[in-house]
């Protein structure tokens, strides 16, 4: 698995929770988009829902980190 700087701890969080691989892959793709967008717009506010998880994050390109991250089971 490719680990992106600033997303490593979140990837480990997914692995600890034993999330399905497609959720990890989707978040990794979202993080790559954040890295690309982060070079022009900062901070980048991202959110999506996949497989019952609502993922929200704010990516700050200046520090190359995700400054806020929540995953909530959809009701």
Swiss-Prot record:
It comes from the Viruses. This is Uncharacterized 8.4 kDa protein.
């Amino acid at each position: 698995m490719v680990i992106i700087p600033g997303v490593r701890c979140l990837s480990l969080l997914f692995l600890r929770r034993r999330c399905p691989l497609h959720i990890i892959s989707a978040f990794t793709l979202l993080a790559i988009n954040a890295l690309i967008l982060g070079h022009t717009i900062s901070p980048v506010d991202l959110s999506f829902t996949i497989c019952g998880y609502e993922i929200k994050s704010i990516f700050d390109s200046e520090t190359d980190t995700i400054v806020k991250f929540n995953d909530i089971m959809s009701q």
